[in-house]
Amino acid sequence: KAHEDELKNHLCMINTDMAGVVIGYDVARVIGTKEATAHCDAFMRRKGYNVGVTQEIYSSDSIPFADKGVPAVNFIRFGHHVGGTFIHCRNDLAKFLSEQSIAKTTQFVLDYGIELIESEVFPFERVVPTEMVEKVDKYLAKKELAEAKKDK
């Protein structure tokens, strides 16, 4: 809340999560309009990056931004448990990561960010559509919290 007034200057939030997994696959989860999703997908295809792009929420640092109306693109490298991803547990070890994998993620995230920054006209609206807002609200349990406050 201390920086809430600064959000008006943010057109999109880019978040990277779980990068570096050796055995895995790259995805982008867009919390934004269908146009924002299509833009990200077209960019990845045009540049030849093998990144699966979908419009859906993702539990990460982008949620507070989306909750305030700032669209977000989450870049994630999901892994497989055989030589892959163990998250927040005793098997969450650096031996399952590689510099090459981190460099690959870094490159397409950087390229995408540059595309947005250098656009003379921003390529999609600064909108989180209603259906995405509802999913974010459900994730944050806003309805349940409001009802709990009423019951007090």
Label each region the model flagged.
Residues 82-151:
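His/Asp/Glu-rich mid-to-C-terminal helical/loop segments that flank catalytic regions of hydrolases
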